[in-house]
A protein has these predicted regions:
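Extracellular attachment/recognition segments
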Residues: 1-84
């Protein structure tokens, strides 16, 4: 298994941001997870969703939507794991 950070970003308070990452081989089994890197105690900071576009016969594009559920900006990392 291979893991890594695809990108880092900031999501402003009470808002959403959408990123995409392209050129992933269609035969890779990729899972995504998003982790806040801004510490804050007391509850969840983000919610996220991943959508998939088959960009070509060989490549996949992933669209990551991240929602900040707090009243402060949150820095995030979009992490991936290639399972095969």
């Amino acid at each position: 298994m291979t893991t890594g950070v695809q990108f880092r970003g900031t999501v402003p308070a009470n808002s959403s941001r959408r990123w995409f990452t392209w050129g992933w081989p269609e035969d890779w089994h990729v899972t995504w997870y998003v982790v806040p890197t801004t510490p804050e105690q007391g509850g969840p900071q983000i919610d996220w969703d991943v959508e998939v576009e088959r960009a070509s016969s060989d490549d996949v594009t992933y669209w990551l939507s991240i929602q900040n559920t707090t009243n402060e900006s949150v820095q995030v990392e979009a992490r991936y794991a290639v399972l095969n």
